Regions:
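Hydrophobic alpha-helical segments within soluble ligand-binding/sensing domains
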Residues: 24-52, 99-101, 148-152, 168-187
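Hydrophobic alpha-helical
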Residues: 1-4, 72-73, 89-154
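Flexible loop/hinge segments that line or gate small-molecule binding clefts
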Residues: 1-31, 53, 149-157, 161-162
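Hinge/cleft segment of the Venus flytrap/periplasmic-binding protein
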Residues: 57-61, 65, 80, 175-220
């Protein structure tokens, strides 16, 4: 039988697609949003706040990454005892920096919000640029992203973004090659790596890592 390794982007209906010959290597999107929610919960609790209003800048609606990054962030707020209310209708910027800037700009001075949560760094940077252009309070309104891109990490070091989440592309590539060899040889797909499998043995998880001002230098 043909061996297939999906990498990074999960196939639709993943539970019914994967089997002993068809596997997936990637990062658990539920983990990435969780890190955003935990960071923001700690940030606001340190100020004595347990109720916040947020702007959510979404990728393409319906993408598995958009759904799980958003849901896991909001779940983390709940798990941390935070009351988080969306300040306006969801902002849908389709993963694009310019779209995010255009959509956030009119909200900066018309909507009351405590933070901006973006499904990726590109949109987080667009939101930061909108805040800067419209005179928003970047110092006290944290913006968080996901991916730990070069620009995203640079923005953290400059204080323009508060945090991001590192998605290990090299690790995913190594994991996919490892899984392919193991499929051919009949071994568990994570053999020879440090990565964990899900309960089915058909998914190899490459962990996300939170990136803040404290550790951003390690990712630049």
């Amino acid at each position: 039988d043909m061996k297939i390794v999906f990498m990074n982007k999960q196939p639709a209906d993943i539970e019914n697609v994967l089997n002993d010959n068809i596997v997936y290597v990637g990062s658990d999107e539920m983990e990435s949003g969780k890190y955003q929610g935990e960071f923001l919960s700690d940030y606001f609790k340190a100020q004595g706040k347990d109720e916040i209003k947020y702007l959510m800048v979404n990728g393409v609606l319906g993408d598995i990454a958009q759904i799980q990054r958003t849901e896991s962030c909001l779940q983390a707020f709940e798990d941390q005892g935070m009351t988080a209310v969306e300040a306006t209708a969801p902002v849908v910027a389709d993963w694009d920096r310019a779209n995010a800037q255009d959509l956030i700009s009119p909200l900066v001075n018309t909507v009351d919000f405590d933070c901006i949560i973006a499904n990726n760094d590109a949109m987080a940077l667009g939101a930061a640029e909108a805040m800067e252009q419209q005179g928003g309070d970047l110092e006290n309104i944290p913006i968080v992203g996901i991916d730990a891109t070069v620009d995203g990490c640079q923005a953290i070091s400059e204080g323009r973004l508060a945090m991001t989440v590192f998605q290990d592309a090299d690790g995913q590539g190594f994991g996919a090659l490892t899984a392919a060899v193991n499929l051919i040889e009949g071994n568990p797909i994570n053999e020879g790596s440090e990565y964990e499998l899900d309960e089915t043995g058909h998914i190899m998880w490459v962990p996300f890592e939170p990136v803040t001002a404290e550790n951003v230098e390690d990712y630049m």
